[in-house]
Amino acid sequence: MDINKNEINLNRQFSRHVPDEWDFFENSPGENNFLENKSQIRGIFFFFFFFFFFILLILDLIIIIGEL
């Protein structure tokens, strides 16, 4: 009984300082939230894709305006 109470107290102290997304007892990283990590990677990929796309678009417009 004492061991279980100590574990519960440790879990409460641990959960005070750690956000819910870092719940190592429920969702260890790389196992249950694989889809969330996949969507984050996909979001980063699309961000950089559109970022470079708009940079190339702006450079192309500058070149076209310069040729006129």
UniProtKB/Swiss-Prot annotation:
Predominant location category: membrane
Statement: the UniProt record of this protein carries the keyword Transmembrane: yes
Membrane topology: Single-pass membrane protein
Localization terms from the record: Membrane
GO CC term, one of those recorded: membrane
UniProt KW keywords: Membrane, Transmembrane, Transmembrane helix
Transmembrane annotation, as ranges: 44-64
Protein name: Putative uncharacterized transmembrane protein DDB_G0287945
